[in-house]
Amino acid sequence: MKEVIHEMYSKEQIDQMVTEIATRINKDYEGKQIHMICILRGSVFFCADLAKKITVPVSMDFMAASSYGNEVKSSGQLMITKDLDDDIDGRHCLIVEDIIDSGNTLSKICGLLAARNPASLKIATLLDKPDRREVDVEVDLSLIHISEPTRRS
């Protein structure tokens, strides 16, 4: 049987949500420069779309991390496969992620980056699944919240 996929949001709706988040970022960072940290690979297009709508000065860097290695199941150990090229000491950093569910990997990334003394460290995500959290991660900006459906007994 062929699976039917239903569109939840149109391209135009998503574009409008990106504009709304960019407007909030512009207000929150007025008079400051943002250093966007794009978590590879999933967030590349979201990060690019967001950066185009931000009017305050922006620089961008990339980080790739995995807790899976060559396994199908997470090992729980964070492996940085591509670290930042730039020093973030004293900079206002915005981590841009595509999907946040358990929060495990992102929590470890935040701890690693916080130890590098940024002036501020915030998180923006395209898709947030707070019901799936295994660790506490404060998401500052999210486009879409997905709640797990309640299962019937």
Label each region the model flagged.
Residues 6, 26-28, 52, 70, ...:
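Short secondary-structure boundary/capping segments
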Residues 14, 36, 64, 95-98:
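Generic structural signal for small/hydrophobic residues in well-ordered secondary structure
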Residues 18, 57-93, 104-107, 133-136:
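Short, glycine/charge-rich flexible loops or terminal/linker lids adjacent to PRPP-binding catalytic cores
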Residues 26-70:
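Conserved PRPP/pyrophosphate-binding segment of the phosphoribosyltransferase/PRPP-pathway fold
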Residues 61-65, 119-132:
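ATP-dependent adenylation/pyrophosphate-handling site
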Residues 144-153:
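Single conserved hydrophobic/aromatic residue that forms the stacking wall/gate
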